[in-house]
Amino acid sequence: MKHLSDAVFFVCLSICALFSLTLCDGEICQVGNMAIPVGKEQPDPKGCAKYECLSQSNRVLIKKVTCASQALKRGCKSVPGPAGKRFPECCPTTLCRGKQWGQ
């Protein structure tokens, strides 16, 4: 009898886990003209960022990831990323006197 109750519990637990995994299956995040499936990401065509479509606690969420702002130290400068590159290659870099500047 103990084995039967353990088996029933395991089957119920497996069904619940499968249901929670497929609950957002097929869901899409809409960002402007972009449709991003849950679990996927796409670069922002208009800027240096990317969007991620996520499923969390039975909710569909959109996460926007952008370049971080940098506090420049003395002797350093911010260099813009190359135009036309996708995130994160489009983010600015920091160059400081010394090795990077060849001095």
From Swiss-Prot:
PTM field: Contains 4 disulfide bonds.
UniProt keyword annotation of Secreted present: yes
Signal peptide location: 1-24
Tissues showing expression: Expressed by the venom gland.
Keyword terms, alphabetized: Amidation, Disulfide bond, Secreted, Signal
Keyword Secreted listed: yes
Sites bearing Arginine amide, chain numbering: R97
InterPro entries: SVWC_dom
GO cellular component: extracellular region
Entry protein name: La1-like protein 15
